[in-house]
Amino acid sequence: MANIKSQEKRVLTNEKSRLANKAFKSEIKTAIKKALNAKSNDDANKAELVNHAVSLVDKGLKKGIFKDNKAAREKSRLMSA
């Protein structure tokens, strides 16, 4: 454990951020899986699911959860075929 007061605060803040990022990543993974399943099964609402997943990936990039290349790769995978 940290000895400095500001570092003790940072430990708590980092833990909150870690949990929030973990939840957001899980939400994105679920959206991507749903979109890819909809594309392979040729569902009627596949465009809506793909748009939602791409939107979440963009938000993750904006928040700094994803790096540029990963976001581009995921978006490309969602948009292809």
Swiss-Prot record:
Keywords: Ribonucleoprotein, Ribosomal protein, RNA-binding, rRNA-binding. GO terms for molecular function: small ribosomal subunit rRNA binding; structural constituent of ribosome. GO terms for biological process: translation. The keyword rRNA-binding applies. One of its GO terms (cellular component) is small ribosomal subunit. It comes from the Bacteria. HAMAP family: Ribosomal_bS20 (MF_00500). Belongs to the bacterial ribosomal protein bS20 family. Binds directly to 16S ribosomal RNA. This is Small ribosomal subunit protein bS20. The gene is rpsT.
